[in-house]
């Protein structure tokens, strides 16, 4: 006796075929684009140059704190680029953070120990922290590396003037400060630091009107540095131009509210 043949179920066949097609599609098209479980989704890496551009723009706008943070990100993204250390050190000096400026400049020296700008900024940062002899040594090193560096001569002049004001000068310290400030200007009359140093040398020699002229040019080159406005205000006050002095002291305070000196003069 023959067994009755079992009839196929068309619906079951259709469902099985659909399941097979779905599995094939899932493995070929979907799985390759999925991340494994518990693995974070990769994020797009930002171009290190974009941090530098952002920092430069912020610095130009006078937003020094934000610019410093952007330069820190640029350094993290590209720790071997010396320009970022030099730029952040300069802005840290502008904003009065001399200790951190020293660290940044020291890192620049570690990266390239024959860079005149790195030594000049290091000397400036030290000088502003009353480490006059150490700062002077770094400034001299900068000049020996690049005798045509206006920045190096300006920093050297400024530190010598600081020594005179602090009563730590020798017989020829003032004469040397005057000479170095003139050399810096002769090398680059458009360098802010050259005008700043020349103004300071003139100030401590009581040439207040000439100092005002130099500080005013420096402010035109960068109007966002509190110390420049403070210096300009001091010299206006010495000339008896009290309204102008108060304006500059107020501007200095608005740029750096943590500095008590503007309020002291006001």
Give the ranges of each region predicted by the language model.
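Helix-start (N-cap) detector for alpha-helical repeat units in TPR-like alpha-solenoids
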Residues: 48-49, 82-83, 116-120, 150-154, ...
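Long, contiguous interaction/recruitment modules in multidomain scaffold/adaptor proteins
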Residues: 1-47, 132-133, 137-147, 151-161, ...
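Structural signature of tandem alpha-helical TPR/SEL1-like repeats
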Residues: 62-69, 95-107, 129-141, 164-183, ...
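Canonical tetratricopeptide repeat
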Residues: 87, 121, 155, 197, ...
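Alpha-helical segment of the N-proximal tetratricopeptide repeat
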Residues: 46-83, 87-97, 128, 162-166, ...
